Amino acid sequence: MKIVQYDDVEWKRGLQHRGGTFHYRHLLNGTPGTLGNFQFNIGQLEGDFASPRHRHNFDQFRIQLEGTMNFDRNGKMAAGSVGYFPEGAPYGPQRSEGTSVTAVLQFGSASGSGYLSREEVYAGTEELKKFGTFEGGIFRRNDDVEGRRQTDGYQAIWEHMNGQRMEYPKPRYRDPIMLDPANYEWLPVDGMPGVSEKPLGSFTERQCGASIIKLARGSTYRAGERSVYLVLSGSGIAYDAPYL
């Protein structure tokens, strides 16, 4: 188990292949080069942030902590909402309505396409700048460079780093799924007195899912394997280490 204190992590500038201002705190990551690689960040976007309509070859969960994120025809995520953005399903264009803070978990999913590490994305971005420019989330090749004139920024990076054309997986869901946890009821967790849960959903044949857990004072929760937890309030002990 690894515990990261949010306040111990510095803000950094990121998403340079998209448009506008984005800073993040990088909390956790998996093992680069593996199909199950993942990345967990908390990002802050300003009102000038913009991202074109696009899709992923990985899965994504989003927790809107502050502000409102606008995904155009796919709807808005207000503070407190949770979103599941499945691989292959287009969404956006995306923009922030003022300052927005979001916890984002991205991970290799059912198609087996894996997930690029932040270091790989940065390296690919810098290498591609030798052949073109990133504008508004799109990579545009210079006129004297062979290849497609314009490509989604992340797709261009993925193809450059993998040396092959990206084949998007067929979407298991047509659209992102946005959830309002406030409308869920708390359920007791069997065998764990004082622990309640809001199971928000389980998705695809790989059964990736999201839940909200609440612990009464003095209660104990047994964490599952291959799970990532974000503590939003309170304090306690996790595997003999404190969290605040």
Tell where the protein language model's regions lie, with residue ranges:
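Jelly-roll (double-stranded beta-helix
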Residues: 1-63, 68-244
